[in-house]
């Protein structure tokens, strides 16, 4: 009899987004006339930049000629893409990152989970609360936690609350932890970390031999000057941090699939016998064994992001979604609903009005406004009493959704 991975049985019933989809489908079936506006899952809506489309079309044509046909690509991704990434995303910000330290992949979500393949099972892991559910669930699947308690918190994880009181930036752990997940700009709260805050984390990690897993998927949305876009802008980060990036939310690649992970060659981890091993070699071995790379066509599209035209077009996309976020923030504030985020991130973190729970507010929005958000409690117990709205939508949908919410919640009185 084949045995299953019993750790999957510890997962809370239903991943957050499938549960949202289930409720929305049930409502849509019962009310087929309803025009539902989905502002929950952070999927982009606007077309791929023209520069990317043109590059991909050209690459398709190359695949039709024997002389320019490409088969399996390099395990880390093509050098021309990695060079462009290193030059534009890191070296331009005085980050000491080389193209050889970049691994191209088909998604930062995948990499955030797959990185656990090279880490041991006895690490103490710290996550913020609320948090992107993938960080938690992949550790549960890998057997790094015990069961969940009645609050949905897993034994073995160290939860670091991020609240309005601490400006949605967690304090350093009071105990020693081995692995730390940080996401800035933050999903779901939209908060950013100052240089000083990140320096504190880097100093902590170096003092305790900890590893920071830094998710920078939304760095392109940072508008405030002086806010770091990369953990490697912080002195000492090369010795303690891995960074995840994605083209999904910057260049609209959610359906095209391209991302990258940075593993500095100076980064070390400890083996069971006490020896030190460089994580770059482990990650290279893992990727070479389990991943065949991103398609040549998609990598050419990603390379075009760094062209002059591509940079202008991507900036246009980012500004479009940030304007959506501004509209959401402004309209909700005008009817007395407290909001956070949406300035340096495409997400607006909404305080539920009238003492409603996260799921109660979700259901009220769905049933009375025909608008879908993401319940804050789905991101962790500290997210209870909040709901995330995504700016990834058409301008018409955002304006209509805010009109509907405004008509229902005028004078909600949730300003804090």
UniProtKB/Swiss-Prot annotation:
GO BP terms: lysine biosynthetic process via diaminopimelate, diaminopimelate-aminotransferase pathway
EC numbers on record: 2.6.1.83
InterPro entries: Aminotransferase_I/II_large, DapL/ALD1, PyrdxlP-dep_Trfase, PyrdxlP-dep_Trfase_major, PyrdxlP-dep_Trfase_small
Binding locations of substrate: 15, 42, 109, 132, 187, 292, 388
Modified residues (N6-(pyridoxal phosphate)lysine): 249
Pfam family for this entry, one: Aminotran_1_2
Cofactor: pyridoxal 5'-phosphate
Pathway(s) served: Amino-acid biosynthesis; L-lysine biosynthesis via DAP pathway; LL-2,6-diaminopimelate from (S)-tetrahydrodipicolinate (aminotransferase route): step 1/1
Keywords: Aminotransferase, Pyridoxal phosphate, Transferase
Binding-site residues, pyridoxal 5'-phosphate: 72, 108-109, 132, 187, 218, 246-248, 257, 292
Catalytic activity: (2S,6S)-2,6-diaminopimelate + 2-oxoglutarate = (S)-2,3,4,5-tetrahydrodipicolinate + L-glutamate + H2O + H(+)
GO molecular function: L,L-diaminopimelate aminotransferase activity; pyridoxal phosphate binding
Disulfide partners: none
Quaternary structure and partners: Homodimer.
PANTHER family given in the database record: AMINOTRANSFERASE
Family the UniProt entry places it in: Belongs to the class-I pyridoxal-phosphate-dependent aminotransferase family. LL-diaminopimelate aminotransferase subfamily.
Primary role: Involved in the synthesis of meso-diaminopimelate (m-DAP or DL-DAP), required for both lysine and peptidoglycan biosynthesis. Catalyzes the direct conversion of tetrahydrodipicolinate to LL-diaminopimelate.
Name this polypeptide is given: LL-diaminopimelate aminotransferase
Species of the source: Synechococcus sp. (strain JA-2-3B'a(2-13))
Name of the gene: dapL
């Amino acid at each position: 009899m084949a045995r299953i991975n019993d750790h999957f049985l510890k997962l809370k019933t239903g991943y957050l987004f499938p549960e949202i989809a289930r409720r929305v489908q049930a409502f849509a079936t019962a009310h087929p006339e309803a025009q539902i506006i989905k502002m929950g899952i952070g999927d982009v809506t606007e077309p791929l930049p023209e520069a990317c489309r043109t590059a991909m079309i050209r690459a398709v044509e190359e695949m039709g000629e024997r002389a320019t046909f490409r088969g399996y690509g390099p395990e880390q991704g093509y050098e021309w893409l990695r060079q462009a990434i290193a030059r534009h995303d890191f070296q331009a910000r005085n980050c000491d990152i080389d193209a050889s330290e970049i691994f191209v992949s088909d998604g930062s979500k995948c990499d955030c989970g797959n990185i656990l393949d090279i880490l041991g099972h006895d690490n103490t892991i710290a996550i913020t609360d609320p948090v992107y559910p993938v960080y938690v669930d992949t550790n549960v699947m890998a057997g790094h936690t015990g069961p969940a308690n009645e609050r949905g918190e897993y034994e073995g994880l160290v939860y670091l609350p991020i609240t309005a009181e601490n400006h949605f930036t967690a304090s350093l752990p009071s105990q020693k932890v081995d692995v730390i997940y940080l996401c800035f700009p933050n999903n779901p709260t939209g908060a950013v970390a100052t240089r000083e805050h990140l320096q504190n984390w880097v100093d902590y990690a170096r003092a305790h031999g900890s590893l920071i897993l830094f998710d920078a998927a939304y760095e392109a949305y940072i508008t405030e000057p002086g806010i770091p876009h990369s953990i490697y802008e912080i002195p000492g980060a090369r010795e303690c941090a891995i960074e995840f990036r994605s083209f999904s939310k910057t260049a609209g690649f959610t359906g095209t699939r391209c991302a990258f992970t940075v593993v500095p060659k100076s980064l070390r981890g400890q083996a069971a016998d006490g020896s030190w091993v460089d994580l770059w070699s482990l990650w290279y071995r893992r990727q070479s064994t389990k991943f065949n790379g991103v398609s040549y066509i998609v990598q050419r599209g990603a390379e075009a992001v760094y062209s002059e035209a591509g940079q202008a077009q991507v900036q246009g996309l980012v500004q479009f979604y940030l304007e959506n976020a501004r509209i959401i923030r402004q309209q909700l504030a005008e009817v007395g609903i407290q909001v956070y985020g949406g300035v340096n991130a495409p997400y607006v973190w909404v305080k539920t009005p009238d003492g409603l729970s996260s799921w109660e507010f979700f259901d009220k929005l769905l049933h009375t406004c025909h608008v879908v958000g993401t319940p804050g409690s789905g991101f962790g117990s500290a997210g209870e009493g909040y709901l995330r709205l995504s700016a990834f939508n058409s301008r018409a949908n955002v304006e209509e959704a805010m009109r509907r919410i405004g008509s229902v919640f005028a004078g909600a009185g949730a300003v804090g």
